[in-house]
Amino acid sequence: GYEEREVAETVRELDAA
């Protein structure tokens, strides 16, 4: 769903930080 996609994107950004 939309939330899953947003969460996955946020996790990527946090992991790259």
Swiss-Prot record:
Tissue occurrence: Expressed by the venom duct.
Cell location: Secreted
GO molecular function, one term: ion channel regulator activity
Keywords: Gamma-carboxyglutamic acid, Ion channel impairing toxin, Ionotropic glutamate receptor inhibitor, Neurotoxin, Postsynaptic neurotoxin, Secreted, Toxin
Location (main, coarse): secreted
Positions of modified residues (4-carboxyglutamate): 3-4, 6, 9, 13
GO cellular component, one term: host cell postsynaptic membrane
Transmembrane annotation, as ranges: none
Function: Conantokins inhibit N-methyl-D-aspartate (NMDA) receptors.
Note: The mature peptide does not contain cysteine residue.
Name of protein: Conantokin-Qu
Record organism: Conus quercinus
